[in-house]
Amino acid sequence: MKSLQIICLLFIFVARGSCRSCEICHNVGNDCGYDYVEECHSPEDQCGKVLLEISSAPLSIRSSHRNCFSSSLCKLEHFDVNTGQETYLRGRIHCCDEKKCEGRPFPGLPLSHPNGYVCPGVLGLFSEDSSESEAACKGDETKCINIVGYRKERFPGDIAYNIKGCVSSCPELRLSNRTHEERRNDLIKVECRDAVKITPSE
């Protein structure tokens, strides 16, 4: 339970903005209360809200984050990663021109079936070389995503994370889209490729 909460707080791809002030808050749950307003810095220019969810049946953890965003990150809008073993990492990003943005609610997980494609599956914390399992892609998931990065904290220090799994399309996420805390969050690998089609044995 605690590990899922930590992972939720790690995967926040947000950025500060220019000539704008936005509400800043972070909380486990569907929403976060008002914490403080912070002036954003170049090159980002919009306020935004990120909703994150990690669901590993039967457990589900959600977190909410308001911060300053870059327009390039706002275009990402959402992501859904099937990391295998009935585990999903999902995010919804909503940007606006106001200090306080209201995020869009999560839709329910689709009742989809395996489609014959597979990807390496990892939802790893504290290591960029976490053990892989096979993620059986479902529905329209035909791409494999691989994201590796580091979260730098005073304690316990650098925290590595590694996400691999099935996605329906490759997100417009590049190494240049680093988080607002460049000294604290380092996105070092983003790869996306076609999933492997498994041929049924005769």
From Swiss-Prot:
> What organism is this sequence from?
Elaphe quadrivirgata
Q: What is this protein called?
A: Phospholipase A2 inhibitor gamma subunit A
* Domain of life (superkingdom): Eukaryota
Signal peptide location:
1-19
What cellular component GO annotations does this protein have?
A: extracellular region
- Stated role: Inhibits the enzymatic activity of all phospholipase A2 (PA2) groups.
Where does tissue-level expression of this protein occur?
Answer: Expressed by the liver. Not expressed in esophagus, stomach, pancreas, spleen, gall bladder, small intestine, rectum, kidney, trachea, lung, testis and body fat.
**InterPro entries linked to this entry:** CNF-like_PLA2_Inhibitor (IPR050918), LY6_UPA_recep-like (IPR016054), PLipase_A2-inh_b-type (IPR016338), PLipase_A2_inh_N (IPR004126), Snake_toxin-like_sf (IPR045860)
The UniProt entry lists the main location of this chain as: secreted
Subcellular location(s): the record lists: Secreted
Q: How does it assemble?
A: Heterodimer of subunit A and subunit B.
- Per its record, what are the GO molecular function terms? phospholipase A2 inhibitor activity
| Glycosylated residues (UniProt) | 177
Q: Which family does it belong to?
A: Belongs to the CNF-like-inhibitor family.
Q: What does the PTM comment state?
A: N-glycosylated.
